[in-house]
Design a protein with these regions (language model features):
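N-terminal beta1-alpha1 ligand-phosphate binding loop
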Residues: 1-21
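Short glycine-rich, Thr/Ser-proximal phosphate-binding strand/loop in the N-terminal lobe
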Residues: 20-37, 110-115
Length: 184
């Protein structure tokens, strides 16, 4: 039985590696679709399921998707640097929620769930936003910031697990994996 991470995210791979898992990385070819409204948790789970649906045989495939939720609006990955800066302006001085959906495919079945973490960012100055966006770091991250990177200095409060914000809630993953692959 082989564990496969259906993601090109180096952050998800790093979390799995640090938790002691042996796995292959095979980014999913699943198309992401815009948030249709409704429950952000259901949306992240549906995207994670689409990513995990690929694979077969004796593989256990893990898919995940993360969004930032502010005042009921879902912030995915920014389209460009201007979009990333706009997201950071909206999040500045505010508390928001990060939702990560995880799905595991094994033996033709898909199990999924989600985890939520609340974060508060301090008020950000315009020059800080510009300098951070200029690093390029926020361009591939939901909400336009990387908690595990340069944006860590913006966070004043974290309620929940950091790995949910980084993109792979390990406690949830452990529950979803077949027993023979679970790590303590």
């Amino acid at each position: 039985m082989r564990l496969v991470l259906a993601s090109s995210s180096p952050r998800r791979a790093s979390l799995l590696r640090a938790a002691g898992y042996d796995f292959d990385v095979r980014p999913s070819g699943a198309e992401e679709w815009p948030f249709p409204g409704g429950d952000p948790a259901g949306y992240t789970e549906a995207l994670a399921q689409a990513k995990a649906a690929e694979g077969g045989g004796d593989e256990v495939v893990v898919g995940a998707d993360t969004v930032v939720v502010l005042d009921g609006s879902v912030l995915g990955k920014p389209a460009d640097a201007a979009d990333a800066a706009a997201m950071l302006r909206r999040l500045s001085g505010r508390t928001h929620e990060v939702v990560t959906g995880v799905a595991v495919r094994h033996d033709g079945e898909i199990r999924s769930g989600h985890a939520r973490t609340r974060l508060t960012l301090r008020v950000l100055e315009e020059d800080e936003i510009s300098a951070y966006v200029d690093t390029g770091e926020p361009l591939d991250k939901a909400g336009g910031y990387g908690y595990q990177g340069g944006a860590a200095r913006f966070v004043t409060r974290l309620e929940g697990d950091a790995d949910t914000v980084i993109g792979l809630p390990l406690a949830l993953l452990r529950e979803l994996l077949p027993p023979e692959l679970r790590r303590a």
